[in-house]
Amino acid sequence: MIRSYYLILIACLFTITDMNAQKTNLPIPVKIVAQQNGYILMRDGKPYFIKGAGGTSYTDRLVKYGGNSIRTWDTKNAMTLLNNANKLGVTVTMGLYVATERHGFNYDDTIAVKRQLEKLRIEVKKYKNYPALLIWGIGNELNLEYTNPNVWDAVNDIAKMIHDEDPNHPVTTMLAGLGKKEITYIKTRCTALDLISVQVYGKLANVPKELHANGWEGPYMVTEWGPTGHWEGGETAWKASLEETSSQKAAVYQSRYEASIKVDKHCLGSYVFLWGQKQERTPTWYGLFTENGEESEVVDVMQYLWNGVWPAIRAPHIDAVLLDNKKAADNIYLQPGKAYKVSFVATDPNKYPLTSRWELLPESTDLKNGGDRESRPQAIPSSITDITATGAVLHSPVKEGPYRIFIYILDGFNKVATANIPFFVKKDSK
């Protein structure tokens, strides 16, 4: 009798626990509503403008600075990520990995296409009820280096499948750029999509005008945007891309956002790239943070754009970086094994004393497209000496070839300014 009582009690406890788990694991409905002059995203019946970032690092800081959403490229660690996002009060645009033509997938292979759809169905059913889920993202830049338009039929079939399995969340696909051809394909062959997502860098300010010119009058979001891309700016005579300083990046992040995302009523929000750090051409090009977790001036800008308030402690500002009294765009050639002066001008808005960290790297040769993983070059030790408040001495490598010197200006409060200058070591240089 006593044993039966305990068994009933345990069963009741499990039932209550399961009910509580279900209460905390219910989907929050999200939908897009058309308005007279555009569109608005509604989450749980309330307007929701996406103030997001791409990446899963430093999400606590994103919340602290006014962000409300993160974006992923696949469902790796999705359960942990969604649960953590829910605890922090942020949402997730969940990427579904879809194979690309440029990596060898054949969209004429109907069996492989069907197999991929059914694999994605499992993922959708697994995560559709998590309250932090905001939007499903089908693939990433499927139009990059592609030739087969059948990919759009596959995208549409995936979108229809998602709507069948999950009526509570909108579906999009992420486009590299915003070409008229792709817009036409999507309007005619991807009618199950609820919105499109564009990924642009230097041309962000032109997005509203270009979308209109290319025939898109529906809702959209910007799922990647950031500095001038390595393919968009200047380069040296030896094809090394010229990177903006962190201060130059901060200026263009703000101006381009305010000219497009902030004012276009068809835009539902955005995900800045990248809320973290990665090696892509250089270790500093796209990440808003350094490898040590230090925050650049761009993070200050994002806090201002998200909530209208600048942080109390601002990042250092860097200007006028010179190597051998030349700018990065001057095609700097150095002789091997010689000493050269590097100078910079840096200021701190809070008047804090600044220090510097230096690094010399060979120019990266592991160059990929579409954000594919790249390896970081190994630093060359003992190359920078005589460090002062305004510069240092670079001892050029003995081996001929392309290199890049990096400068990190630190304020002691986890804020940083970054800059780099490419140069080429050549025996007969003057």
Q: What do the predicted segments below correspond to?
A:
Residues 396-399:
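Residue-level recognition of secondary-structure-to-loop junctions
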